[in-house]
Structure formats: C-alpha cells, structure tokens
C-alpha cells in the first residue's frame, strides 16, 4: 500500500545542509497500523509529511496505492491526496463552524451534493461517537472530542490511508487510550492503512502491528511490534522499550551508589527480560548456582504484540567473583544486564 524507497530529505540553511532523512526504505501493507517512533528531531514528522508530499523528498520514491507521488503534477497530486487523510497533534478545526460543518468541509470543497454530505457526515459522526455534538462548536468540546472531529473530517473523502502525526501528544492518558481504541476500530471496520508517528512507545505497544525506529534521520530498526519488543537489536530500541516501564532508582540508593566496586559494596543492576527469558526462573537459578542472594527493589511486566517483556532493578549479594559469574550467566541467557553502580 505504501512504499518508501531510498527517500532522502535535505533542508538548507544558507550554506548549511541538514539531512533530515537518510535513505529511508519502508513497506507498509494494506490494512496495517504502522508506527514510526523517534525522539524529537529524529525526522519522523518529516517522513510522514513526505508521504503526502507536504514535503517533497530530495530524492527517492513515495508510492501510495501503486502511484509514485513524486512524479505527479500539482493537479494530479491534489487528486491523489484525496486517498490520504491526515490528523495532527493540534486539531486545526474552524472555530466558526459547527462539528457537522467542520466534517463537511472537504466534501463541500469537492463539490458533493447536500444529500451526500448529510448522509456521509452523519455516518462519520456516528463512527467517531459524536452524533449528539453535531451542532456544537469547537470551543465547547474537550480535547478528545476535537480530535474525534478531526478524525471524522480526515475520513470524509474515503481515504485508503490515514496519517497520524503525534495525534495523541496533546491529550491526557485516558483520552489518549480512547482515541487509540477508536483508531483500532476504524482500522478493523474500514481496513484502513494507518501510518502513525509518535515519540511514545506506549502508543506503539497499544495499537501498532509493525514499527520502525528512527534516529538522526536514519532507519535504525524495523519489524513487528512483537519482534522488536522480544528481540531489540539496537540501544535505541532498548531505550524506547525501557521508557514503557518506569523503574527509577530510589533516592536513598542513588546517594549511596559508587561508580566502582569498593570494600563492603555490592552491585545494583537493571535487568531487561524479553521473550522466553520472562518466564524462565533465572533469578532462583543464579541464587542456587552461584551461592548469592538477590534482593528485588522493583519490577514490572507488560505485553506488546502478544509478547511479554519485563524489567527489574535488583541488588546482588555475594563475593565479587560470584557476582560477576551470575551477571555473565544472565547475559548468556539473553538478559540485558546494566550495572548501575555499587551500593555502599
């Protein structure tokens, strides 16, 4: 459905070149919810704007439903964009128009009949759960309701693709979840291909089938959500996975942490478990095998793409050789171990 082939985007500031995208290659199948995640400035918003030619790539191809958008004239591109809906972090509703009139706007601009507009908008407002708000104005809506109006408006032309650029970033957690559930339902009902840009791994975990991770304008890693969470290959992937599990070090431990081992200290470790390692009794194994004690300060477990993953912060009590042997054993069994320091 969407093919991004060797896409590069360069911005110019005087004599300075800024490479926002570097040789990006992605394929997004029909009916997929595909997430692109990256930190601020990674290039993800530039990428999504290239998909509908709001930003024209410096080089490369963007093929949507078999049509290479980079080769189209302006009138042809305008017609092709009717197959691509888009929603943003900010809702961009017209304050002087009612909910009904905001959703109807693309249909009016396309020259549709009043009968078609009435039928279509009524159907869309029912889909997004806003039938009773049709005569309300944006000022009287919550943030979540405004985003629902924006979604209905984006679907007015029956697009085959919906682009979501940080669509939940301005919403509270409960409202974010309701919007994500709505997008999942729309994907199921309409078989709509959704390309979703976010900096939050929780959003990817909740809704996406596949994900690509972008850093510094480059494609760092891609795959199914289950594969990325079960077998992250890069440090950036580990960082985003870690962000979904909030395991901070207690303050009293932070002040006692030493960078190197000294007499009377013991290691404080952060362990990341993915895939099969989540269910393996590794902590009891190392306790018995190496004659050490393990004190778990905090732990968390979650699911993404049908795969369990978890994290733990723990203290290891033993002599230096046994501690190191236990850490090696965990790493040999595909547990990512980070020694945070040594508690004195």
From Swiss-Prot:
| Taxonomic source organism | Vibrio cholerae serotype O1 (strain ATCC 39315 / El Tor Inaba N16961)
UniProt similarity note? Belongs to the ABC transporter superfamily. Methionine importer (TC 3.A.1.24) family.
The EC code for this enzyme is: 7.4.2.11
Q: How does it sit in the membrane?
A: Peripheral membrane protein
**General function of this protein:** Part of the ABC transporter complex MetNIQ involved in methionine import. Responsible for energy coupling to the transport system.
One Pfam family this sequence matches? NIL
- The identity of this protein, by name, is Methionine import ATP-binding protein MetN
The cross-references to Gene3D superfamilies, in alphabetical order and at most eight, read: 3.30.70.260, P-loop containing nucleotide triphosphate hydrolases
Q: Supply the enzyme class, top level.
A: translocase
Q: Where in the cell is it found?
A: Cell inner membrane
The family database entries (NCBIfam families) matched by this protein are listed as: ABC_MetN
Q: Which PANTHER family match?
A: AMINO ACID IMPORT ATP-BINDING PROTEIN (PTHR43166), METHIONINE IMPORT ATP-BINDING PROTEIN METN (PTHR43166:SF30)
- Show the catalytic activity: L-methionine(out) + ATP + H2O = L-methionine(in) + ADP + phosphate + H(+); D-methionine(out) + ATP + H2O = D-methionine(in) + ADP + phosphate + H(+)
Q: Which residues bind ATP?
A: 38-45
Alphabetically sorted, this entry's keywords are: Amino-acid transport, ATP-binding, Cell inner membrane, Cell membrane, Membrane, Nucleotide-binding, Translocase, Transport
Q: Which gene encodes it?
A: metN
Q: Which InterPro entries would you find in this protein's record?
A: AAA+_ATPase, ABC_MetN_proteobac, ABC_transporter-like_ATP-bd, ABC_transporter-like_CS, ACT-like_dom_sf, MetN_ABC, MetN_ABC_transporter-like, NIL_domain
Q: Which GO terms describe its cellular component?
A: Gram-negative-bacterium-type cell wall; plasma membrane
Q: Residues in domain ABC transporter?
A: 2-241
Which GO molecular function, any one, fits this protein according to its record?
ATP hydrolysis activity
Outline the subunit composition. Answer: The complex is composed of two ATP-binding proteins (MetN), two transmembrane proteins (MetI) and a solute-binding protein (MetQ).
């Amino acid at each position: 459905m969407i093919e991004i082939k060797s896409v590069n985007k360069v911005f110019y500031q005087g004599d300075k070149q800024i490479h926002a995208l570097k040789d990006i290659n992605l394929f997004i199948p029909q009916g997929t919810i595909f997430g692109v995640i990256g930190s601020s400035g990674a290039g993800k918003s530039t990428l999504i704007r290239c998909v509908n030619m709001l930003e024209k790539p410096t080089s490369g191809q963007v093929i949507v439903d078999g049509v290479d958008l980079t080769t189209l004239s302006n009138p042809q591109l305008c017609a092709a964009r009717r197959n691509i809906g888009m929603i943003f972090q900010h809702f961009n509703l017209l304050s002087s128009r009612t909910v009904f009139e905001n959703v109807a706007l693309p249909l009016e601009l396309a020259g549709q009949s009043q009968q078609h507009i009435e039928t279509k908008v009524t159907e869309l407002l029912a889909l997004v759960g806003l039938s009773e708000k049709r005569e309300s104005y944006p000022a009287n809506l919550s943030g979540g309701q405004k985003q629902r109006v924006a979604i209905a408006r984006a679907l007015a032309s029956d697009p085959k693709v919906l682009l979501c650029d940080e669509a939940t970033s301005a919403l509270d957690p409960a409202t974010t979840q309701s919007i994500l559930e709505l997008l999942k339902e729309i994907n199921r009902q309409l078989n709509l291909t959704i390309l979703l840009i976010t900096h939050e791994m929780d959003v990817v975990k909740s809704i996406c089938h596949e994900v690509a991770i972008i850093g510094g304008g480059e494609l760092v890693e891609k795959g199914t959500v289950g594969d990325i969470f079960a077998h992250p290959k890069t440090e950036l992937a580990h960082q985003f996975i870690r962000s979904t599990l909030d395991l901070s070090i207690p303050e009293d431990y932070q002040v006692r942490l030493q960078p190197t081992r000294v007499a009377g200290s013991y290691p404080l470790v952060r362990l990341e478990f993915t895939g099969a390692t989540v269910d393996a009794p590794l902590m009891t194994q190392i306790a018995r095998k190496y004659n050490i004690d393990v004190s778990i300060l905090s732990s968390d477990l979650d699911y993404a793409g049908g795969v369990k993953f978890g994290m733990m912060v723990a203290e290891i009590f033993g002599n230096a050789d046994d501690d190191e042997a236990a850490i090696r054993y965990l790493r040999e069994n595909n547990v990512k171990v980070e020694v945070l320091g040594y508690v004195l």
